[in-house]
């Protein structure tokens, strides 16, 4: 089976889940799947995907896995006790052919946030691996290894010694086995330039650093859970700070567009959070504006981190490093380009939260094609509230 452990997911699912347990245990949410590749027919693979999800829902955390989580400084004991009882339930997920009859499939995840938050990453990994295992029966492993070696070598040139990358590629990986190979090669070839992985299973298995803080779904849910819509981003950041007390201090900047983020990210947040993550829009313009914002708030940019994670490849990593090196702390999270580049077109698939407590929620990305909402009227209202054109 594809997913062999409930740890085979991104760290930020655990960090967000802990906030949900402590602050929003009664929240009810809905997620929907979308494949952005035109012409891809996923319908023939529905039964195989269902079988993998059935297996996923049979998994439990082992004592060794719980002990590992207990050893992470930001994970609290009551959360680990909850995970000891936790399992995913099939009753919260439905998969069927889309009504559009164009090869798309509908995957709807609906239920208590606390009991559905762990579906997204493994389900996306399942869809990917089911699809590629059936469309590429004899993968071009040698080509994949050649490309990987070339990419990693491009980061070991003189002058790039402090350029560090991390793996953010679980959800869109070619396969579990290839993912592990990529991580082992990255650590072997890059040494200290390999910062770690977002994947908790591989971090535990290979003694790597697990990385991650928050995702868009957390800030989106706060549109419904906060005191009023305009204050939802501030509410989300303040709630995060109350939970982690200065730990896990990387804020995600594009849920409501970067302009709205800068308006909300005042001197208090600039000093409190360790840095900011970029996930859409022009990264060079974003970085310049973020550094200028820190300076305007009388915060030394060199004390803060800029994390880049939007569709990175190695040439872009190098260009960003050369632009911002010595001006701030830097980190780069590389996803699909690292874990799914054997010469085939990767699937552009996502699972996004669309409702919380019966109300629509949305992300106003700095890349319009990333915006996903099933209620156009709410999307227009959200843009008006946050001043997004």
From Swiss-Prot:
GO terms for molecular function: nicotinate phosphoribosyltransferase activity. Transmembrane segments: none annotated. Its EC number is 6.3.4.21. One of its GO terms (biological process) is NAD biosynthetic process via the salvage pathway. The keyword Ligase applies. It is an enzyme of class 6 (ligase). It catalyses: nicotinate + 5-phospho-alpha-D-ribose 1-diphosphate + ATP + H2O = nicotinate beta-D-ribonucleotide + ADP + phosphate + diphosphate. Transiently phosphorylated on a His residue during the reaction cycle. Phosphorylation strongly increases the affinity for substrates and increases the rate of nicotinate D-ribonucleotide production. Dephosphorylation regenerates the low-affinity form of the enzyme, leading to product release. It comes from the Bacteria. Pathway: Cofactor biosynthesis; NAD(+) biosynthesis; nicotinate D-ribonucleotide from nicotinate: step 1/1. One of its GO terms (cellular component) is cytosol. The modification Phosphohistidine is found at residue 216. Keywords: Ligase, Phosphoprotein, Pyridine nucleotide biosynthesis. InterPro entries: N/Namide_PRibTrfase, NAPRTase_N, Nic_PRibTrfase, Nic_PRibTrfase-Fam, Nicotinate_pribotase-like_C. Catalyzes the synthesis of beta-nicotinate D-ribonucleotide from nicotinate and 5-phospho-D-ribose 1-phosphate at the expense of ATP. Belongs to the NAPRTase family. This is Nicotinate phosphoribosyltransferase.
């Amino acid at each position: 089976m594809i997913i062999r452990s409930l740890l085979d997911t991104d760290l930020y699912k655990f960090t967000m889940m802990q906030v949900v347990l402590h602050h929003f245990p009664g929240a009810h949410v809905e997620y929907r799947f979308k494949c952005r590749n035109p012409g891809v027919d996923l319908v023939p693979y529905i039964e195989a995907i269902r079988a993998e999800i059935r297996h996923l829902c049979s998994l439990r955390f082992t004592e060794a896995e719980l002990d590992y989580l207990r050893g992470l400084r930001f994970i609290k004991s009551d959360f680990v006790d909850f995970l000891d009882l936790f399992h995913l339930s099939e009753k919260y997920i439905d998969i069927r052919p889309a009504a559009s009859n164009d090869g798309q499939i509908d995957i709807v995840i609906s239920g208590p946030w606390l009991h559905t938050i762990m579906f997204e990453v493994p389900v996306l990994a399942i869809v990917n691996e089911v699809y590629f295992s059936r469309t590429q029966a004899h993968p071009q492993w040698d080509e994949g290894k050649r490309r990987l070696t070339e990419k990693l070598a491009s980061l070991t040139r003189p002058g790039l010694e402090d350029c560090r990358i991390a793996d953010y590629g679980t959800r869109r990986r070619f396969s579990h086995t290839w993912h592990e190979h990529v991580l082992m090669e990255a650590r072997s070839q890059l040494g200290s330039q390999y910062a770690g992985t977002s994947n908790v299973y591989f971090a535990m298995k290979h003694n790597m650093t697990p990385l991650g803080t928050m995702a868009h779904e957390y800030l989106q849910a706060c549109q419904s859970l906060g005191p009023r819509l305009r204050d939802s981003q501030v509410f989300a950041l303040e709630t995060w700070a109350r939970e982690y007390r200065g730990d896990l201090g990387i804020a995600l900047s594009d849920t409501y567009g970067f302009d709205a983020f800068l308006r909300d990210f005042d001197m208090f947040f600039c000093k409190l959070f360790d840095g900011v993550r970029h996930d859409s829009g022009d990264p060079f313009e974003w970085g310049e504006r973020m550094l200028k914002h820190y300076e305007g708030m009388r915060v030394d940019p060199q004390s803060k981190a800029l994390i880049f994670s939007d569709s990175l490849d190695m040439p872009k990593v190098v260009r960003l490093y050369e632009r911002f090196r010595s001006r701030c702390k830097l980190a780069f999270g590389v996803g699909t380009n690292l874990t799914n580049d054997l010469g085939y077109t990767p699937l552009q698939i996502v699972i996004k939260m669309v409702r919380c407590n019966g109300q629509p929620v949305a992300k106003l990305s700095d890349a319009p094609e990333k915006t996903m909402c099933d209620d156009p009227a709410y999307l227009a209202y959200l843009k008006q509230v946050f001043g997004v054109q």
